[in-house]
Amino acid sequence: VVLSKECAKPLATPKVTLNKRGFATTIATKNREMMVWQPFNNKMFETFSFLPPLTDEQISKQVDYILTNSWTPCLEFAASDQAYAGNENCIRMGPVASTYQDNRYWTMWKLPMFGCTDGSQVLSEIQACTKAFPDAYIRLVCFDANRQVQISGFLVHRPPSATDYRLPADRQV
């Protein structure tokens, strides 16, 4: 991941002083230390969503890691209005809140890739799914058959029309 020069700089150590009652206080030495998280059009998805979009090479390394651990990769996709957890697109069994991340379902691209040992197979399926649904969110999830749980999930494609994402430099005000 390549960060901008501004992001790569370490933050200055804040100056610690004691107030009249003996409590430690800090004084922000730079404006960057007092920034506020941008709550609008700054949505995140699962693992790695705080990073800039992953390159094909970075996705390939993640796929290799998944296969090295004998996990089962699976592609899922969703339209932009169905991708985020919300009251409109969640399946409920009674009065359940929609804040739990798995309380919504994405459409599975084909079947999970059971027994897949070649990362290029996964990458070609990502390309095929992207070609078929260019304006959909596409994520790669992986499952551990021994523990019977989802291990990880991350976006491999964000639609070009998406306006709900901010670059790391624009995430704070």
From Swiss-Prot:
* Protein role: RuBisCO catalyzes two reactions: the carboxylation of D-ribulose 1,5-bisphosphate, the primary event in carbon dioxide fixation, as well as the oxidative fragmentation of the pentose substrate. Both reactions occur simultaneously and in competition at the same active site. Although the small subunit is not catalytic it is essential for maximal activity.
Q: Which gene encodes it?
A: RBCS2
Chief location category: plastid
Q: Which GO terms describe its cellular component?
A: chloroplast
- UniProt family annotation: Belongs to the RuBisCO small chain family.
Name of the protein in its database record: Ribulose bisphosphate carboxylase small subunit, chloroplastic 2
**Record carries keyword Chloroplast:** yes
Localisation per UniProt entry: Plastid, Chloroplast
InterPro entries the UniProt entry points to: RuBisCO_ssu, RuBisCO_ssu_dom, RuBisCO_ssu_sf
Please verify whether the record's keywords include Ligase: no
Q: Which GO terms describe its molecular function?
A: lyase activity; monooxygenase activity
**Record-linked SMART domains:** RuBisCO_small
**How is the quaternary structure described?**
Heterohexadecamer of 8 large and 8 small subunits.
